Amino acid sequence: MPAHDDDIREGAGRSARGSDDLAAQVTYLEQEIAVLRRRLRDAADAPRGGRAVEERINELQATVAGLTSQNERLVATLREARDQIVALKEEIDRLAQPPSGFGVFLEDVGEGNADIFTGGRKMRVSVSPSIEGGTLRPGQEVMLNEALNVVAAFGFESVGEIVSLKEILEDGSRALVTGRTDEEHVVRLAEPLLESGVKLRPGDALLMEPRSGYVYEVIPKSEVEDLVLEEVPDISYLEIGGLDGQIELIRDAVELPYLHPDLFKEHKLRPPKGVLLYGPPGCGKTLIAKAVANSLAKKVAEVTGSDNVKSYFLNIKGPELLNKYVGETERHIRLVFQRAREKASEGAPVIVFFDEMDSLFRTRGSGISSDVENTIVPQLLSEIDGVEGLENVIVIGASNREDMIDPAILRPGRLDVKIKIERPDAEAAKDIFGKYVTTELPLHADDLAEHSGDRQETVTAMIQATVERMYSEIDENRFLEVTYANGDKEVMYFRDFNSGAMIQNIVDRAKKSAIKDFLDHKQKGLRVSHLLGACVDEFKENEDLPNTTNPDDWARISGKKGERIVFIRTLVTGKRGGDTGRSIDTIASTGQYL
């Protein structure tokens, strides 16, 4: 037993020396447990002493378990504190770092070096090994560290200044551009622009990064795109009624030179440069121009045997070209003809269509408060004359005031062919009605019964009755009484002011009446009474439209030329009843704004 006491005292000494360390305490307790176990074995013959030792062992084991759990919690706390300290240190180091700069990659010079542009200077710097060789592209944005070494690569610049392309230089990688104040700059073409395959044209708007001198992309200019519609309209000559003679003339002027160029060359016949379509409103001028482009595309495809042949229809909205800034309208006209030349150089026929031509190209010197036509007209004249040596381009103009267009535009050699689009007569009106009133429409049973159920005969009879109502010289059809300057008077009927647009409107009114009858009385189908009633409604609606304040100008727009008109009196009794005519007040001086 004395030996065992010595072991306990030795263990107690070790415990005292390690009281400040939890690990030392655990070791001490484990050793004491081992000593007690030995004592337990030695005291196997002494039962009472063994029970006391066993109780002591259990107490020590419970103490060890508690200290172990406490130790694990302390270890976890220390680990968490260490992680927080490391994160804070990293954050402090990150915040203490100097700012990173950006530059534009210019060229890879090998051996891990590259030329960049940053801070207004061109520099040769090292490239980080983390960036694979050959991945940097000219014009690309790169990140620089404190030592101005390339450490990361990004995309390409997406903001900057808008410049206008003047020309591509011989090396193909640089271009001459003009800025806002017409200053000229030589810039580099960024790789995305070179690889995009976009054909750069003089006048294109480009995105430039002014500090590095790179241009990155072509910016569409809405001011030009809105004025030009390159799609060929899906309208054929079959959809146009009552204008067979005019269609034949324009086909001879436009299609023959492109379909049979050898015959024209053999006869030394020069194709016409332009066509003027003139006449009163609503008679199909714009419709014919659209059909020309569609028909020309199909004819060229038939002759060449290829479905890939295109024709281009450049639809120029006249009033939208006008700009208050001097030279802007002329610039737009140049861009339009520049685009026409580009398309024509590819072998495709191009039609440049000016709608409402009188709004742009008025007679020079006729302006009251503006003289823009003094420069716009010469610009068009020079462009048309410039088309002389260029094949596959023709100019088509449409106007209802051809008397206001400058005579220099209308002379032979510019707009060679002049086609008047007349108001439809009775036969033409039947043809136009036939485009809108067809056998596919639902027809009333009573009307069908009158013609033995034959839909074609029913439609023909309905059109015949409607045209007779419109073109008969009866009192209900009297529209205006005009007084000329020489005192003569003339009665005009609604037929004198009929148009394809009015006929379409009459048919639409009749169809609407048929729908209302079906909803109210459950009687389905179009009737001749609907068409006749629509004629009356259309005539009534047009009663107040004649301009009695300046009847001569109104008559010119409506297609009535000749002796000057001084008075107009409407003969249709309107809602107010009585005479609605007014005489013309003669004013000595109206000033420049009237």
Curated annotation (Swiss-Prot):
GO terms for cellular component: proteasome complex. Pathway: Protein degradation; proteasomal Pup-dependent pathway. Residues 20-98 form a coiled coil. Pfam families: AAA, Prot_ATP_ID_OB_C, Prot_ATP_ID_OB_N. SMART domains: AAA. The keyword S-adenosyl-L-methionine does not apply. Residues 593-594 are annotated as: Docks into pockets in the proteasome alpha-ring. Keywords: ATP-binding, Chaperone, Coiled coil, Nucleotide-binding, Proteasome. Gene3D superfamilies: 1.10.8.60, 1.20.5.170, Nucleic acid-binding proteins, P-loop containing nucleotide triphosphate hydrolases. GO terms for biological process: modification-dependent protein catabolic process; proteasomal protein catabolic process. GO terms for molecular function: ATP binding; ATP hydrolysis activity. ATP binds at G282, C283, G284, K285, T286, L287. Belongs to the AAA ATPase family. ATPase which is responsible for recognizing, binding, unfolding and translocation of pupylated proteins into the bacterial 20S proteasome core particle. May be essential for opening the gate of the 20S proteasome via an interaction with its C-terminus, thereby allowing substrate entry and access to the site of proteolysis. Thus, the C-termini of the proteasomal ATPase may function like a 'key in a lock' to induce gate opening and therefore regulate proteolysis. Homohexamer. Assembles into a hexameric ring structure that caps the 20S proteasome core. Strongly interacts with the prokaryotic ubiquitin-like protein Pup through a hydrophobic interface; the interacting region of ARC lies in its N-terminal coiled-coil domain. There is one Pup binding site per ARC hexamer ring. Upon ATP-binding, the C-terminus of ARC interacts with the alpha-rings of the proteasome core, possibly by binding to the intersubunit pockets. Consists of three main regions, an N-terminal coiled-coil domain that binds to protein Pup and functions as a docking station, an interdomain involved in ARC hexamerization, and a C-terminal ATPase domain of the AAA type. PANTHER family: AAA-FAMILY ATPASE (PTHR23077), PROTEASOME-ASSOCIATED ATPASE (PTHR23077:SF144). This is Proteasome-associated ATPase. It comes from Catenulispora acidiphila (strain DSM 44928 / JCM 14897 / NBRC 102108 / NRRL B-24433 / ID139908). The gene is arc.
